[in-house]
Amino acid sequence: MLNNAMSVVILAAGKGTRMYSDLPKVLHTLAGKAMVQHVIDAANELGAAHVHLVYGHGGDLLKQALKDDNLNWVLQTEQLGTGHAMQQAAPFFADDEDILMLYGDVPLISVETLQRLRDAKPQGGIGLLTVKLDDPTGYGRITRENGKVTGIVEHKDATDEQRQIQEINTGILIANGADMKRWLAKLTNNNAQGEYYITDIIALAYQEGREIVAVHPQRLSEVEGVNNRLQLSRLERVYQSEQAEKLLLAGVMLRDPARFDLRGTLTHGRDVEIDTNVIIEGNVTLGHRVKIGTGCVIKNSVIGDDCEISPYTVVEDANLAAACTIGPFARLRPGAELLEGAHVGNFVEMKKARLGKGSKAGHLTYLGDAEIGDNVNIGAGTITCNYDGANKFKTIIGDDVFVGSDTQLVAPVTVGKGATIAAGTTVTRNVGENALAISRVPQTQKEGWRRPVKKK
């Protein structure tokens, strides 16, 4: 079916009182992303010509958080119902486009379901997303005659007979722009809440002899809204369970799917193994045969084939070539790069530093603003002193260098190829190739030394 051009309206003006937060409800995150951003992404993926965001509470915070240039910001100064919210956006509707109505606190709506709704919308009519619930208390009921949708009755306005209806309105619908504007202009607030309900346009359409087609989502979670943190946490687990299932079916071994969080996009090779309590954030790529230990956090990084990341390691904005080993308890900060076969051990931190092929930093080391060659050994307790209190400086270490334990390299400094730095040395000047650098206080020894004793 050929679809008309389409724009999307996202209602996001609610305060979210039950969240007990200074943050607008729709900015609370699910899978590391604001709820409303999930909805915006779905609208854009669906091909929306325009996305109209109706906002009210916390507008400044919303504008700081949402940088999408495709957004048209529509202010709703008073929250007088869903129909009133749509009336604020109506001046922006084109007559010949379809208008899809979504909600900023319904984050798991899928593009597939929305496309089915869009395809099902009859010419001149309304496409409506509905579900059947065992307990529909509190929801607007779908009324029908001879199987055809005739209207929606809000729970507070429903008769006892209507409250027995199990099919309920999700609030998501699509209609033609010209029709939508005409129906919105006819809305009244003659109801128990004193609000303008968008749902009243269903009865208006029926009275005009327009067809209303109901479509059901693939999963109930797609249309579940969030009003409190408990509901948000439940949807988080639903989402994470779905992502884990997809990864398992695609060949990723998750040791415990219930203890894995994906807060972004994961691209992976074959035979990847991920232990418990691992968090993946942003855009992460894992090569073939990558192993990730328990408690690791990987963010916006590329991990090459055959790498092994031991438990409780944090990797952010880093790039690892093949066969690298990291951790446990290592931290790779933005700009860290490991070439093939490099090793970073426990309690080692790297930032804006490159570790060459086969090079090793095994223990208790800080490497910042550094360029380290191939086959270099960095001894325990080594520190690149890259900051003088005002500016950062670089340390360069050539190939085949041996750096002894407890060494401080005061940048800017260069250590030539094949050099050796003796343990306990503070390097303040460049070291030549194949040279030995040593800066220790000469050792003295006092024979027969007696330790002090406590005075009584």
UniProtKB/Swiss-Prot annotation:
EC numbers, comma separated: 2.7.7.23, 2.3.1.157
GO cellular component term, pick one: membrane
Stretch list, region N-acetyltransferase: 251-456
Lineage: superkingdom: Bacteria
Residues reported to bind Mg(2+): D105, N227
Subcellular location: Cytoplasm
Annotated catalytic residues: H363 (proton acceptor)
Quaternary organization: Homotrimer.
Name by which UniProt lists this protein: Bifunctional protein GlmU
Native source organism of the sequence: Escherichia coli O1:K1 / APEC
Gene: glmU
